[in-house]
Amino acid sequence: MTKTLPKDFIFGGATAAYQAEGATKTDGKGRVAWDKFLEENFWYKGDPASDFYHNYVEDLELAEKFGGNVIRISIAWSRIFPNGDGEVKPNGVDFYHKLFAECDARHVEPFVTLHHFDTPEGLHEDGDFLTHEKMDDFVEYADYCFKEFPEVKYWITINEIRSVAVDQYIIGNFPPADTFGFDKMFQTHHNQMVGHARAVKLFKHDGSKGEIGIVHALQTNYPFNESNPADIGAAELEDLLDNKFLVDGTFVGKYPQETMEAVKDILAANHGGEFNIEDEFKAIDAAKDVQDFVGVDYYLSEWMRAYDGKSEITHNGTGDKGTSKVQVKGVGEEKLPDGIETTDWDWLIYPQGLYDKIMRVKNDYPNIHKVYITENGIGFKDTVPDNEETDKTVHDDARIDYVKQHLEVIADAIADGANVKGYFIWSLMDVFTWTNGYTKRYGLFYVDFDTQDRYPSKTADWFKNLAETHIIE
């Protein structure tokens, strides 16, 4: 059966500053934690990325031409404040004013994120989000942006608190590359939620025009054996780590007692430690009802089996299917069920998980006013056809199938009462990916990273028709 989306449903592509802009040393931009981390550990760098810093006019033209009426972008904190605080760099401010003006000229509304994984180097080395003082710096940066860029109508404070903390302190594939530091993970979770809440209250108190929210990466967790109480418990614990701790903190304004007891058990099973949340519930409680939306980034779901052995995580950053492993003592292990497909990077493809997550948000958090799917997409090892002189289209039918299936469950959720207002495909064009460099491609538009030429994909044509008709076919 053909499904449709509401006429006011918005469509666009998503990007992020460090992944798209390139130009990491241009016009006085300060260094971020990733610059040193990549230099010391990898063969790829944050340059050239998609060179959005110089190509944004072309990319926004493509966004408009292929049906996008919104775009997700982020401000590079270190383009505004090269050191994270103190001196403002006028060149960076001017760039974003020009970028937003071009968005307006192209009738593409920007949803602007303040922090998307790119903490300035000095702040990162001085404790990053483990310290309350760095959240002061974040709030001051947010305040500056709210006042400097009144042309922005939609603000996102922080992108994917969970991903930042897990990759920095559990998996170790983000700087500073710690592993199994659950105390640091929970501390970072909490501090970022406090910073987010303070920024929201500041935005509302100052009477800034527009809307503000946060983006959470949410995934649905299922027991591997639905009849096994131990597997059910593992799924519930993983859900606490992936979803409940963060969404409760954001929209309930506190962590329930049973959550804190589970946190203590997880810490005890993994080298102990503790984190400090005293006297800060006032901030997150004050913001819980005044946020305008939540962004949901959805890529995968997980099936969990009980496990109490040694914690071990192997991250698949190469695209060699079947090489990942996640086993966490006191929580559980991820186990692939029969019949569930995965990407080359072992991300489970399960659209029903998005429906289940949307409906849980609707049912469990009635103070969430509306939802945007702020990232959804699939990475492939895309190539341009060999006969590119006559055929410059990337043939990515599997991506169309993936996006179509996820949009269909979004339509189902809307029909069942969920207030989902828009969809951002990750990504507008190919971008640098944090732990895969330039081999994993998501874009509606293929980027030749040597020449910076853009080539459309079949998905781009399909997406254009979708945006024009709102019919999923």
Swiss-Prot record:
User: Which InterPro entries does this UniProt record tie to the protein?
Assistant: 6P-beta-galactosidase, Glyco_hydro_1, Glyco_hydro_1_AS, Glyco_hydro_1_N_CS, Glycoside_hydrolase_SF
The Enzyme Commission number assigned here is: 3.2.1.85
Positions bound to D-galactose 6-phosphate: Q19, H116, N159, E160, D297, T433, W434, K440, Y442
Q: In which pathway does it act?
A: Carbohydrate metabolism; lactose degradation; D-galactose 6-phosphate and beta-D-glucose from lactose 6-phosphate: step 1/1
**SUPFAM superfamilies reported in the protein's UniProt record:** (Trans)glycosidases (SSF51445)
Q: Which UniProt keywords apply?
A: Glycosidase, Hydrolase
Say yes or no: keyword Coiled coil present.
no
UniProt keyword Nucleotide-binding, yes or no: no
A molecular-function term among this protein's GO annotations? beta-glucosidase activity
Give the PANTHER family listed for this entry: GLYCOSYL HYDROLASE, LP05116P
Matching entries from NCBIfam families are given as: lacG, PRK13511.1
Q: What name does UniProt use for this protein?
A: 6-phospho-beta-galactosidase
